[in-house]
From Swiss-Prot:
Provenance organism: Chlamydomonas reinhardtii (Chlamydomonas smithii)
Phenotype reported upon loss of the gene: Short and immotile flagella. Inner dynein arm (IDA) and nexin-dynein regulatory complex (N-DRC) components are absent or severely reduced. Radial spokes are attached to doublet microtubules with an irregular periodicity of 32 nm instead of 96 nm.
Gene Ontology terms describing biological process: cilium movement; inner dynein arm assembly
Lineage: Eukaryota, Viridiplantae, Chlorophyta, core chlorophytes, Chlorophyceae
Post-translational events: Phosphorylated in flagella.
Role noted for this protein: Required for assembly of dynein regulatory complex (DRC) and inner dynein arm complexes, which are responsible for ciliary beat regulation, by acting as a molecular ruler that determines the 96 nanometer (nm) repeat length and arrangements of components in cilia and flagella. Together with CCDC40/FAP172 forms a 96-nm-long complex in flagella.
Biased composition (Low complexity): 844-857
Record protein name field: Coiled-coil domain-containing protein 39
Region (Disordered): 844-894
Amino acid sequence: MANIDPYRTEEELVEDDEEVDMSFLPPFAKGTENEVLYVENARMERRLERTERALETNMDRLHIMDEHLKNVQQELKYTQTRVEAKNKEIESEKHLNAMAEREMGRLKKDIGKMEAERQELADKINGLQNQIYKNNEKLDQFKMLMNWNQEELEQWALAERQKAEDNAALEKYRHADDGKVKELTLALERVSKQVVGRKEELEAEVVETQAAQIQLDKAAEDFRKLHVERQDLIRQWEEAVEAMRHRDAAIAAASEQFAMQKDVLRERKRELDAQARFLENETLNTKEADARVAYYEREVGKQRDVLAREQARTEELNNQVELVKATLSKAATELAQRTVENKQAREDLDAKRQKLDAARKRFVVLKRKLENEFGNLDSMEAKASELEAMRRGEEARLKAILKEHELLKKEQYKRSQVLFDLRQKERELISEISGGQGQNKNLAARIHALDEQVVARAGGVRSEEETRALNARIEKLTAILEGVKRAEDDLLAARRANTSLRADRAKLDETISTLKLENDMVSRQVKGSVEAREKALVDHDVLALEVKRLRDILAAHADEVFSLENRKQQLALSMEERKQEVEVHRDGLRAELRLLREDVHRITLELKERLLRCEKLQAKFEIISAKHRGSGEDDGEERTQAYYVIKAAQEREALQREGDDLDGRIRVAEKEVAALEATLAQLMAVNTNFAASYKKVGSKEAFEERAALRDKLDKAYDKLKARRADEAAIAGDIQVSEARLSNLGQEQRSLQALVDDMTRRKAEAQRQLDEQREKLGRALGRTDKLRQKLGLANSPQGADVELAEVRDVTRAMLLELKALALANPGAMIAEACEAAGIRLPSGGSNPPSLGGSRPGSARSQTSLGSVRSARSVASQQRGGMGGSPAVRTIQLGA
């Protein structure tokens, strides 16, 4: 008896309570213990089938849950990474806010400092304007005093000669005062130089501070760019996570659909099993089919008798009827042969059934004997080997009997199919016979009409008896003819039926063998598909791991490429900045060249003006300048040719180092690209082999899986194309950088040539300037000799003349500064003059000259001032009499 499982569900209990199909159980086994065993075996098979279905369903669910768990863990990992990125982004934003607040505080301090400086400069400007106003008033008073005629000058000179003794006494005090004034002047010059040095240091510190601020601004801008790039990366990450979530949902839906399809497949398999059972039940109708076959055989025998009688009646017919008889006899012979064959097959079937019954009876006897033997427990060990041998022999016989039983079942199924086809043919034959009878009646009527026409054509008139006799004979012959035709039609129909039955039997045999092969193939395909599915799942997991590893490698390489791109952009920005610096330096050199040319031109004009002035001084010896303080033409420090050569060499070395660095990075990037290509080629080979291994598939799940893998492969190809496009773009950028580097080298060479040309011109101008200085020194020496010879070195007339010349030189210098300020508004000349307390003239009037001298231009007055300055320097070097007034040195903006 079956064991009762307490964990079975109600549905399983209901299925177990269903009636078991007893059609396969032979009649002799009913009501015995074999029937109970058969029922228990059937129920156990049902339970096994249900358990297998439940196990397969649970395995599918377990696999789906494992996949879902992996996806959830991966999504959790991505979410944690996104949270960390968001936290870093928040920290970056806080850092940026703090930097902005610090920068705002610094700007406020700078604004306050600039406001204080502006107030201080405004106070200085007011003081300088007041001082200039007072000096202008004094200058106007002096001009009024100097507006004398020649007679007054002579009287004044006479009075001065009378007061020579008084002046001699005062001269001692003047010498002492001049010494003190010189000391104070030297101290003032030292302090001025210190102030200038402090200002230069301050400007250098300001420049360094501005450079540091620019670097900080650049760093802040780069940080902002990196912040924006990180936000873009986070956004791309979120999009990728969303795409993965959609993909996981699609995979879950596909898994559900796969489970549904498997359920449908199981349902269809269940239906096929039900159809098989129905087919087995249909075999029970074979007996009825055999009875009908016997009935049809009897009918055929009756038809033979009818045919024999009809053959006796149709002896007087033509040779065609003889031929029809021979054909009919041949068909009868074949039909008899077919009947004998069918009878022999039935006898064989009965014999096999008897053998099966005998085998089953022997099986029952042996089983009872085995049970009796099991009852004798004392002799079990002694008879174990004998019983085992008997059991093996009986199992072999049972297998043979079961195999023969299966063959008999198949044969019975074939015969039932043949019987079913014969019934179909019987219905068709009946319908054809009825149709043939109708046609025969129509033909008989037509023959009758034709006979009447023949009689009418003969023209003879028959009597009623003859007519009746002829009609009776015609009717008799017509009936005989109809019988012959019917027999012929029946014979032809029997032949056709026999031929069709043979063809149908052959088709059925072929169909049965085909169905067997298909069943075997389907079972093998199911097993193969299950194994292939398991293998595909394993390969899918391996491929997923490989894809994950390759994805990590690709992400690492993408990060490296991204860092290289950032470095490339930084290099491009630095190259642009360097290019701008070179442009600024080139503009500065051009401006310096232009200034040098202007200086050469100005020096040439000054030389001419000085020559004219020397001639004029020689002609008018009464106008002799006293002492002048020279003003150097170059206020700032000059830079020699070696400075620019060294600077250009340093820049060239820096560019060469940058080029070498770029070449090294390019080589590293090329190696990485080659490694990526090799990895990609290996991945493509693996994908190709994988696709080739799954090229021929037969199931819907395999087709769907292959389509999904093809989609993944297409996406991988798209990513590969994008990476190759990025690589091509990087190569193009590198080529552009190399082209820019070569252009910078060409510009450097052109700037070096320009610097060499400017250095050569500067040397030429310096040589000419030295020559002119020598000539000027000789002229000044001659003038000093004439002045000492005439005794005007320390006289009031000489002082007046010197004062007038100082006034003219000051006016000319102011006009020259104004012209320079108007010509170069970006040089900050006017602001520097205002800062130094010098107010430029508003009008364009020329300085007044002393009696008889023609007015000169600003350029000539400047040259005159330069000559007098040189003379003053020469007089100071010689240690001449009298002190020179202090001249304030100002620094003009570049």
